[in-house]
């Protein structure tokens, strides 16, 4: 089912940063600087040199991520389509511009397996973001823009409060399609065309 797509006004915060001229500009980091930071279970990203750290995810966020991962992993493995990956996993979208993200889930096809090296360096075919009440990193529109700009083919936005899944399709690095799934509608994918899973199963309701 197609429908209008709505983003939260702000999906999260950048700790300690405010839009105030009196606040000092954050220190910019390189990709190498980022990889030297101590490991943490909290979501992190490097947004054009600015380190962003969010709160640890809530239990219901992790529940939705787990349900999706198990279903997608079984689908992908049975058909030998590629590999599913689970956050925290750094995705280097742009080394020179210092842009690193950590989507909740990502699918990398056999055709793109070359991007998995010492790190994942390049765009996955599919990324999944579970949007939760807890503070997330940055704004949804911003992150979706990065995914499209750097070659992600499809992005799922699972909104737990509104109980809906938005599936965004990209082509030629532009947003080409928006589909909205609600209630008992099975969520489908152009990247994984035989996959189907109801929102109830994702959210465990």
Q: Where in this protein do the model-derived segments appear?
A:
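Gly/Pro/Ser/Thr-rich low-complexity, intrinsically disordered segments predominantly at protein N-termini
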Residues: 1-205
């Amino acid at each position: 089912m197609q429908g209008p797509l709505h983003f939260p006004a702000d999906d999260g915060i950048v700790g300690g940063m405010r839009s105030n001229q009196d606040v000092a500009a954050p220190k910019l980091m390189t990709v190498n600087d980022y990889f030297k930071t101590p490991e943490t279970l909290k979501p992190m990203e490097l947004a054009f040199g600015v380190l962003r750290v969010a709160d640890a995810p809530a239990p219901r966020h992790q529940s939705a991520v787990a349900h999706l991962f198990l279903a997608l992993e079984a689908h992908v493995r049975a058909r030998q389509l590629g590999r599913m990956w689970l956050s925290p996993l750094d995705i280097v979208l742009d080394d020179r511009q210092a842009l690193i993200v950590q989507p909740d889930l990502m699918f990398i096809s056999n055709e793109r397996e070359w991007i998995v090296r010492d790190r994942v360096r390049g765009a996955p075919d599919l990324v999944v973001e579970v949007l939760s009440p807890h503070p997330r990193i940055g704004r949804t529109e911003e992150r979706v823009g990065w995914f499209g700009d750097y070659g992600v083919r499809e992005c799922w936005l699972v909104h737990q409060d509104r109980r809906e899944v938005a599936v965004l399709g990209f082509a030629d690095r532009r947003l080409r399609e928006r589909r909205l799934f609600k209630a008992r509608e099975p969520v489908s994918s152009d990247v994984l065309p035989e996959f189907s899973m109801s929102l109830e199963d994702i959210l465990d309701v």
